[in-house]
């Protein structure tokens, strides 16, 4: 999907599976958390059916109806996630492309269904975020005062929108449209990079141009 003659001013990046290969780390964290709680989930099942979903939706789909239990499991998963960072890899070609784009005056945002704490911690591990873009590695819970913030110039991206920042997650296009609104850009001026089917559907519905990433 392209918009001939338009100038791209804004790049929106999904994080998990697009900017960083976090599939195995996410999978292992969920499997370990659920095993502790007495639930059975294989790595293969999570990777094939649930990767890319917002945590609360995923836990609901596997039959965990109690909101308090879902929140407890979410926090435990976030706490375990950094222990699997040895499996996380940066998509270096895409990252270098975005750095060049920013150097020429473009804007780059991360737009993800993941939690802000998980994104910050993974970026810190990969060495691609300035000091004001990340929190302490040991802090797994959401800091609502930083929801959808624009970041200072010394940071590696211009803004981050995480799963908690919009009411409707992907495949709804709300997260992408909100990032465009905050930057004052139209869909014709925006390019999206995504990997998952739900992310690609959100990109299509946003009206922007998009690329599918395969890691």
Where are these regions (language model features)?
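Conserved phosphate-coupling serine/threonine residues in phosphotransfer and NTP-handling enzymes
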Residues: 18, 112-114
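Metal-dependent phosphoesterase signature
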Residues: 60-100, 104-106
């Amino acid at each position: 999907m392209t918009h001939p003659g338009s100038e791209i001013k804004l790049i929106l990046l999904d994080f998990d599976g697009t900017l960083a290969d976090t599939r195995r780390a996410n999978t292992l964290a969920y499997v370990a958390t659920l095993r502790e709680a007495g639930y059975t989930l294989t790595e293969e099942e999570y990777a094939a059916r649930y990767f890319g979903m917002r945590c609360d939706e995923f836990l609901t789909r596997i039959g965990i109806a109690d909101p308090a239990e879902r929140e407890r499991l979410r926090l435990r998963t976030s706490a375990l996630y950094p222990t699997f960072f040895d499996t996380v890899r940066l998509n270096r070609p895409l990252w270098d492309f975005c750095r060049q784009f920013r150097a020429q005056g473009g804007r780059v945002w991360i737009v993800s269904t993941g939690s802000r704490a998980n994104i910050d911690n993974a970026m810190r591990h990969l060495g691609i975020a300035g000091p004001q873009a990340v929190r302490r590695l040991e802090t797994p819970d959401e800091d609502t005062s930083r929801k959808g913030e624009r970041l200072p110039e010394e940071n590696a991206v211009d803004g981050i929108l995480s799963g908690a920042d919009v009411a409707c997650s992907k495949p709804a296009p709300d997260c992408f449209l909100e990032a465009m609104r905050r930057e004052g850009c139209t869909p014709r001026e925006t390019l999206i990079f995504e990997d998952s089917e739900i992310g690609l559907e959100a990109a299509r519905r946003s009206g922007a141009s998009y690329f599918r990433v395969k890691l």
